[in-house]
Curated annotation (Swiss-Prot):
InterPro entries: GlcNAc_MurG, Glyco_trans_28_C, GlycoTrans_28_N. Pfam families: Glyco_tran_28_C, Glyco_transf_28. This is UDP-N-acetylglucosamine--N-acetylmuramyl-(pentapeptide) pyrophosphoryl-undecaprenol N-acetylglucosamine transferase. PANTHER family: GLYCOSYLTRANSFERASE (PTHR21015:SF22), UDP-N-ACETYLGLUCOSAMINE--N-ACETYLMURAMYL-(PENTAPEPTIDE) PYROPHOSPHORYL-UNDECAPRENOL N-ACETYLGLUCOSAMINE TRANSFERASE 1 (PTHR21015). The lineage of its organism: Bacteria, Pseudomonadati, Pseudomonadota, Gammaproteobacteria, Pasteurellales. It comes from Haemophilus influenzae (strain PittEE). The keyword Cell wall biogenesis/degradation applies. Its EC number is 2.4.1.227. The keyword Membrane applies. Keywords: Cell cycle, Cell division, Cell inner membrane, Cell membrane, Cell shape, Cell wall biogenesis/degradation, Glycosyltransferase, Membrane, Peptidoglycan synthesis, Transferase. It is found in: Cell inner membrane.
């Protein structure tokens, strides 16, 4: 019997790519073939082959900040990308197409519609991106991570790594903690300059009360070391953290951006958080953070309001019991079967 095949269209950032990989792996375990459609110059080109998933490319890029010439050429570029995607779809003959966001999704989604292939969309953020808003009109099914992106789409959560759900529950992790407050600082894989510059000033004021792990992002270790100065004893600085599940579980509180994947990872582990949303025009990260802050599982500090003093006061006001309650509330908001549910919908529409 011929194997079923899924074409994944996702790219650009980890927030699109990692949830798509989780779904792809779920279907691979069920004997599906997977093919990926991306762009050569974004992270999926290097990342996806590491998971033994073949990847093919179309030429498309974003238009933001590209100037008038790029805008003028945009219709031609999109038309070319649709034709490229259509050719690949005709060659690969997928039973379904999964759109997880990124520049590639738009033209590939149109091509899938032209080829008569069912399109399943997944919106990772609390507010839908332009591509998914448009594709939502032609998709066979739209799924969402948070209940606010689409008014009539099923809420399934964000597919995250299984190891996050395997960590001990917050009440077990917190049971023997009596020492300094454990603070994990994460600025995404690129780090976040505002956190790199603010946290050393926070530690300088309350170094005796904190133990800090700080992921600073690529190339920032030396600069941040110098900023921490004499307080380095309290801080472990790394470019990247390989085992994020363990790092989240170690922490009493996480200070970080509020990308969709980060918010769902924190819920999966069950951790208290202080979110400093990136300042998008559409308030995307702020709305993601509200998913946990609205139930008392997280605190939001807007970047414009972020000062060392505000962060110091926030940390001083936390007790371990208070942070444990936040962590337990975060855990109740997790959706452990997101990848499986997306896979089920794909199977349903592929028949």
């Amino acid at each position: 019997m011929k194997k079923k095949k899924l074409l994944v269209m996702a790219g650009g950032t980890g927030g699109h790519v990692f949830p798509a990989i989780a779904v792809a792996q779920t279907l691979q375990k069920q004997e599906w073939d997977i093919c990926w459609l991306g762009t050569k110059d974004r992270m999926e080109a290097q990342l996806v082959p590491k998971y033994d998933i073949p990847i093919r490319f179309i030429q498309i890029s974003g238009l933001r900040g590209k100037g008038i010439k790029a805008l003028f050429n945009a219709p031609f570029a999109i038309f070319r990308a649709v034709l490229q995607a259509k050719k690949i779809i005709q060659e690969e003959k997928p039973d379904a197409v999964l759109g997880m966001g990124g520049y590639v999704s738009g033209p590939a989604g149109v091509a899938a519609k032209l080829c008569g292939v069912p399109i399943i969309l997944h919106e990772q953020n609390a507010i839908a991106g332009l591509t998914n808003k448009l594709l939502g009109k032609i998709a066979s099914c739209v799924l969402q991570a948070f209940p606010t992106a689409f008014s009539n789409a099923e809420v399934v959560g964000n597919p995250v790594r299984e190891d996050l759900f395997e960590m001990p529950n917050p009440d077990i992790r917190f049971s023997d903690r009596e020492e300094k407050l454990r603070v994990l600082v994460v600025g995404g894989s690129q780090g976040a300059r505002v956190l790199n510059h603010t946290l050393p000033k926070v530690v300088a004021q309350i170094a005796d009360k904190l133990e800090v792990r700080h992921q600073v992002g690529k190339g920032a270790v030396e600069e941040v070391r110098q900023l921490y100065g004499e307080n380095l004893e309290q801080v472990k600085i790394t470019e990247f953290i390989d085992n994020m599940a363990e790092a989240y579980a170690w922490a009493d509180v996480v200070i970080c951006r509020s990308g969709a994947l980060t918010v769902c990872e924190i819920a999966a582990v069950g951790a208290a958080a202080i979110f400093v949303p990136f300042q998008h025009k559409d308030r995307q990260q702020y709305l993601n953070a509200k998913y946990l802050s609205d139930v008392g599982a997280a605190k939001i500090i807007e970047q414009a309001d972020l000062t060392p003093e505000i962060l110091v006061n926030s940390l001083k006001n936390f007790t371990r019991e208070n942070l444990l309650q936040m962590a337990l509330k975060a855990k109740t908001m997790s959706m452990p079967n997101a990848a499986q549910r997306v896979a089920e919908v794909i199977k349903q529409y592929s028949n």
